[in-house]
């Protein structure tokens, strides 16, 4: 891989051990993927997890004197000040959370603690070269916005932020952004949940291929729809780029989506029955519940408003906790507009700066939870909590009853 004289100096340690380690990471990544060079990036997003590996890497760079040339936004870990009022954590878990925040402050990150940066906190333009980690963020910025990012890890995204560059391979190159597989959709998509189930189907069908979707009916996905679609396609598969013909910016036509290549025969037709079968496969669990968890990816203000409408003044069962995880700006807006206070009177709590995959939720493990997000269920089940997946209205009804029928 070609390096400029300046890049060679960084690799040789002339600008400090921390920046050297970041460059070593980028160089190794570039060589692995046959990148011809490094290119400058305009933005970065780091999927910090508040877990040991990510925190160690950031601390290692900081100890070597590194700071970010391109300050990245960050994923959430958990709101230690707020959630410790409700749930017990160990000293080690709290110390790790505090270490994480301190390390990313020192390296110069923008501490947004938000898993959907392309929606509001770090929105790239069409064609911008960026380095975004977080599985739901990458398909959103590539597919819905037409920015250019590979499926970065938190490690490589932070290295790119420190150096201000990323290897030139993969989705940074025009010909690698074209579709690989054609899927037709003839189904009703009425809310975010439907788009999430569609995404889950697409991920299973496409794997790591780049799907091109043709809709038989006219659809207008919202930013939340795009976000949930990509999040689930990256959960059941490894989708980091997609096209929706006539909808997403790089697919004005079917021919453009495939980059002039021969258009393949449709690999599948997704119908209402396809979505229903997928939903049935994901949503079998019933019984008493102890938790409704929403916000994976983080909820927006409009989604919080919809929850208030669905409750219609009714209250959460005393046996059930109801948590909305949202971008901190949405939480602040809800408080300013008195929406948060109204929901709290019904037993609904919301928190910003927090992920579903954190130790603060461990008291719920072993009992049934409910969510509208297959991605949430995937991560929580890895921590020992079975989850049922339902559309939002059903989540609300289950919370009121304290059980899922």
Predicted regions and their residues:
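Non-transmembrane, aqueous-exposed alpha-helical and coiled segments at domain scale
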Residues: 1-405
